[in-house]
């Protein structure tokens, strides 16, 4: 009985499923997919909402989302409306199968339009033959494929932004043009599967053109919406733009137009070209494929309604071309044709008039086509013929009557106009400028281009450097330096860098990682004010400034042993790094290893019982240490849950044979103890174990986006960020009672942020993605709580002023930065490298000297280890020739492009009121000042030095040359290079010798002081 009932139930289910058609299943699956995507989108929005709310930047997210939503909806409605209206018109005007009839007398096919036309006006004209029809159809289908490929390719590049790059904001995409067509065709020909996809596309369109062209229209509308909404930052800049109060020299328009408005116009061009071109091509395809044209083997002319429709679309496309030429006039200021970047002789004298002519001609053609689409051009034919007769001064030219008559025939005008316009555009817009450049400009280039070279020099320097902060001085190192001068400059000598970040990191990884899951990813040079040693202190002088190398000990979960990489360990136990090392840059222990001011983990019995790092007493009295936990850093890539059940506490730090544990009590994180929040983040993070674990309690918090680089880019993607965040130990709450006394945190990350654009006129981008840059923002991230603060460092920059208008609550004044943090801001390395590269060429103000590259500079080459490399900018504490006290600067020497002697050095200042100033010291050209390569040659030629290095290299060790530093002292120069010794079996470098060179003397000794005494012949 039971078996019979089960069998009947099974039969009924089978019958029920049979009633459901496959189309119903597809509809159900489609709507299920849509609902799932909507759910995912909603959870993403809610998760971001909670995350921005935690950081107190919710207004930033709301402003961004409002702009994105407005852009998305507007773009989609306009695009979809345009496509649907035109495809619907094409469907209405196309020839139907019932309108095909064969005449008995002529046995020709006559296509009758859907609108009733008197039989007297029906005419049969020669049709497209099958071969021409196939060429037209497959050519247009190929064009549809190229359009789809181009715009979808742009879309995919926008879909998943890389949060590790310097600037997350997308660049303005290139429009669909000949260059993009060639690139796509090359890709298709080199990939057989793309060729197969094109054939499949062709068959689909031929079988059901209206269906598939409508589907592609929906896809393109979605793509347009996504791409344009991704440029919300450009729209906000347009709405809140701030004048630069400086105009370019061609059109005399304020630079703000090029920076804030021109990108939006280019984005509009990108959209309109795709919109009108696809609509135009799709409608032509529908008309050509209608009325059984392929099966009949020919196609008769377009009907009057079809012609009017195509003329309207063609007029819109030509109007877009006119708009494109209007934009191209301004884009000449970014031309690369001439000897320098920006508009040159040919651009201004030939290309600009050509663009204006082609733009006006396109406007006239668009008007002509619109007239044909709305009325009939024959109604004004007599007036146009009279005008042409008047322009020919009454001469009768019968030969052209036929051409004119054809022009006013609807079936001929569109093809003739587009063909002739293309020919004129190639001749006027490409051929003539190329001939002028080769035949007129290049033979007399310097005379033709001088005024434009001046413009490029001026605008490039202004774009990369605040010229008000750049001073150029003559530096003549002819002072005879003595050992007494070194004693009088003791602070400079004590801060000559003997330890580079690379050997320090190697040593840290050998001696200070403590456990395999700890890692020192980076080390940074900074300066701190410490108490002097007791023997050096005086009543009025207790402290001194000292350069140090600081490195954070972060936790890298990927280094946890594979068997221990469980869900609980990843998210609940291995949550944070601990501590840091602090090393003076020029102090060495007896065994040649670097000395540490701060090192190790765990209580130090010789110091305080509650200490967790081994710290020298005078250092502990100089800087705060606290409990240096690092929950937010450069390696914190996992999402963690804190304040969970007590059975799985967070690993704090190793303590002898056991471990110390901790429970996070910081202000960071989002409470997920409630069920709905757990569901949201389980979906957002795609981690369903969050719903199944029993470890969560009502106080449990989720900490995610802990990587500081991704963190700041998620908040402000419109800024460009330095590649090197650096750790600072400071007490910003010094003197305040509201600080967390139980677990005080004193670790902060500082990241330099830049405002950039690639639309600054006449400014040469060289190899950069931008041609304007300012270090406008300093970002401070709390390594324990995760809070982020943005401080405006350059309030004069128009771009950051624009962003302050758009996000009024986001940015703080630099004066609001706590003093303990402000003393650690430094001139950013990335900016300095860009500026030094620009100045190597653009220091030449004379256009003739610039054209001939007579005074071109380069960055010198040094030997590091056994490899040659460009000298990297280096921080040092020194006294500038024009100043009275020592300061922290960033320095880079220059040599001439074809020689090895020093020609100049660039210094960037970092202290106090002088922060941000640049000093360019140029050496006299009539005297020889030894360069880096020349000093390296002197070192290699010294018999004692070369013999000792060769001996080390034969004894199972490897001698490594460190950075060769040029140190300015009292209007003179000394050169210092450390020599490290590293065993082949163990990468633990030790400092064994120091080479010092002054003038043509070179000595190598075990210590810096011995080398200085020897080179200055002190007994």
Swiss-Prot record:
Q: Which cysteines are joined by disulfide bonds?
A: none
Asked if the Swiss-Prot or TrEMBL record annotates the protein with the keyword ATP-binding, the reply is: no
Predominant place of localization: membrane
Can you name a GO cellular component term?
plasma membrane
Segments passing through the bilayer:
23-43, 67-87, 128-148, 192-212, 213-233, 270-290, 313-333, 355-375, 416-436
Q: Where found? A: Cell membrane
- Domain of life (superkingdom): Bacteria
State the UniProt keywords alphabetically.
Answer: Cell membrane, Membrane, Transmembrane, Transmembrane helix
Q: How does it sit in the membrane?
A: Multi-pass membrane protein
Which family, according to UniProt? Belongs to the UPF0182 family.
Cross-referenced PANTHER family: UPF0182 PROTEIN SLL1060
- Which NCBIfam families does the annotation name? PRK02509.1 (NF002707)
Q: What is this protein called?
A: UPF0182 protein Tery_0938
């Amino acid at each position: 009985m039971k078996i019979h009932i089960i069998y009947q139930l099974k039969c009924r289910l089978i019958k029920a499923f049979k009633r459901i058609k496959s189309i119903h299943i597809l509809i159900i699956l489609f709507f299920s997919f849509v609902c799932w995507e909507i759910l995912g989108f909603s959870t993403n929005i809610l998760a971001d909402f909670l995350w921005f709310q935690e950081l107190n930047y919710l207004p930033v997210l709301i402003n961004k989302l409002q702009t994105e939503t407005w852009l998305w909806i507007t773009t989609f409605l306009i695009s979809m409306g345009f496509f649907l209206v035109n495809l619907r018109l094409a469907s209405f005007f196309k020839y139907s199968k019932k309108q095909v009839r064969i005449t008995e007398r002529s046995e020709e096919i006559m296509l009758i339009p859907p609108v009733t036309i008197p039989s007297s006006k029906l005419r049969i004209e020669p049709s497209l033959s099958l071969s021409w029809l196939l060429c037209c159809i497959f050519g247009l289908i190929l064009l549809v494929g190229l359009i789809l490929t181009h715009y979808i390719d742009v879309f995919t590049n926008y879909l998943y932004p890389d949060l590790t790059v310097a600037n997350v904001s997308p660049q303005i995409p290139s429009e669909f043009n000949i260059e993009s067509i060639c690139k796509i065709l090359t890709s298709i020909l080199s990939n057989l599967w793309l060729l197969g996809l094109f054939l499949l596309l062709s068959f689909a369109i031929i079988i059901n053109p209206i269906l598939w062209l409508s589907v592609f229209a929906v896809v393109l509308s979605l793509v347009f919406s996504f791409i344009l909404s991704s440029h919300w930052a450009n729209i906000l800049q347009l709405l809140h733009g701030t004048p630069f109060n400086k105009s370019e020299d061609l059109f005399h328009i304020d630079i703000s137009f090029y920076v804030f408005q021109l990108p939006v116009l280019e984005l509009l061009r990108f959209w309109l070209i795709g919109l009108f071109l696809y609509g135009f091509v799709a409608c032509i395809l529908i008309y050509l494929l209608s009325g059984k044209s392929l099966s009949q083997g020919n196609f008769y002319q377009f009907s009057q309604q079809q012609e009017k429709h195509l003329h309207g679309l063609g007029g819109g496309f030509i109007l877009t071309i006119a708009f494109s030429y209007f934009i191209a006039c301004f884009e000449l200021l970014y031309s690369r044709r001439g000897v320098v970047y920006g508009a040159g002789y040919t651009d201004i004298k030939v290309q600009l008039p050509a663009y204006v002519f082609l733009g006006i001609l396109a406007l006239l053609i668009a008007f002509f086509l619109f007239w044909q689409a709305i009325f009939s051009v024959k109604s004004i034919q007599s007036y146009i013929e009279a005008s042409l007769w008047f322009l020919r001064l009454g001469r009768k030219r019968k030969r052209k009557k036929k051409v004119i008559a054809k022009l006013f025939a609807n079936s001929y005008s569109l093809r003739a106009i587009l063909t002739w316009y293309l020919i004129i555009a190639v001749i006027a817009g490409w051929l003539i400028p190329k001939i002028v450049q080769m035949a007129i400009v290049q033979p007399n280039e310097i005379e033709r281009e001088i005024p434009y070279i001046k413009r490029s020099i001026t605008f490039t320097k202004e774009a990369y450097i605040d010229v008000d902060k750049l001073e150029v001085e003559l530096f003549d190192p002819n002072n005879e330096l003595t050992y007494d001068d070194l004693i009088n400059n003791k602070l400079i000598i004590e801060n000559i860098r003997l330890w580079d970040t690379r050997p320090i990191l190697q040593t840290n990884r050998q001696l200070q990682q403590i456990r395999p899951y700890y890692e020192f990813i980076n080390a940074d040079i900074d300066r701190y004010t410490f108490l002097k040693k007791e023997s050096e202190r005086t009543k009025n002088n207790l402290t001194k400034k000292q350069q140090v190398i600081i490195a954070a000990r972060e936790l890298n979960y990927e280094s946890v042993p594979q068997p221990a990489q469980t869900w609980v360990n990843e998210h609940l136990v291995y949550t944070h790094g601990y501590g840091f090392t602090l090393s003076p840059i020029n102090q060495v222990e007896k065994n040649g290893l670097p000395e540490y001011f701060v090192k190790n983990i765990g209580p130090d019995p010789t110091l305080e019982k509650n200490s967790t790092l081994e710290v020298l007493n005078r250092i502990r009295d100089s800087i705060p240490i606290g409990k240096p936990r690092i929950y937010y850093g450069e390696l914190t890539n996992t999402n963690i849950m804190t304040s969970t059940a007590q059975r799985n506490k967070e690993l704090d730090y190793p303590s002898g044979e056991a471990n110390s544990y901790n429970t996070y009590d910081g202000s960071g994180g989002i409470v997920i103890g409630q069920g709905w929040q757990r569901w949201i983040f389980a979906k957002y993070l795609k981690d369903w174990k969050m719903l199944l674990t029993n470890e969560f309690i009502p106080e449990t918090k989720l900490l995610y986006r802990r990587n500081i680089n991704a963190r700041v880019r998620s908040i402000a993607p419109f800024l460009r960020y330095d590649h090197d965040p650096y750790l600072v130990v400071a007490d910003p709450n010094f003197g305040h009672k509201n600080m967390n006394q139980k677990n005080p945190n004193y670790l902060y990350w500082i990241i330099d942020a830049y405002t950039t654009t690639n639309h600054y006129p006449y400014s040469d981008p060289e190899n950069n993605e931008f041609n304007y840059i300012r270090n406008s923002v300093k970002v401070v991230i709390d390594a324990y709580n995760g809070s982020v603060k943005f401080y405006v460092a350059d309030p004069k920059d128009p771009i950051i002023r624009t962003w302050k208008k758009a996000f009024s609550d986001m940015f703080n004044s630099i004066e609001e930065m706590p003093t303990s943090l402000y003393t650690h801001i430094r001139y950013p390395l990335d900016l300095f490298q860009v500026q030094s590269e620009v100045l190597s060429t653009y220091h030449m103000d004379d256009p003739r000297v610039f054209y001939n590259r007579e005074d071109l500079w380069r960055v010198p080459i040094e030997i590091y280890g056994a490899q040659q490399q460009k000298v990297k900018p280096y921080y040092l504490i020194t006294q500038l020739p024009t100043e009275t006290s020592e300061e922290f600067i960033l320095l880079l020497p220059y040599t001439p492009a074809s020689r090895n002697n020093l020609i100049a050095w660039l210094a960037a200042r970092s202290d106090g009121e002088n922060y941000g100033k640049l000093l360019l010291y140029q050496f006299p050209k009539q005297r020889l000042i030894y360069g880096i390569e020349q000093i390296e040659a002197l070192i290699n030629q010294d018999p004692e030095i070369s013999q000792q290095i060769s001996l080390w290299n034969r004894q199972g060790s490897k001698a490594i040359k460190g950075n060769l530093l040029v140190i300015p002292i009292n209007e003179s120069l000394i050169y210092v290079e450390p020599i490290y010794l590293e065993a082949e079996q163990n990468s633990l470098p030790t400092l064994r010798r120091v080479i010092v060179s002054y003038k043509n003397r070179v000595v190598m000794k075990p210590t810096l002081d011995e080398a200085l005494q020897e080179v200055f012949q002190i007994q």
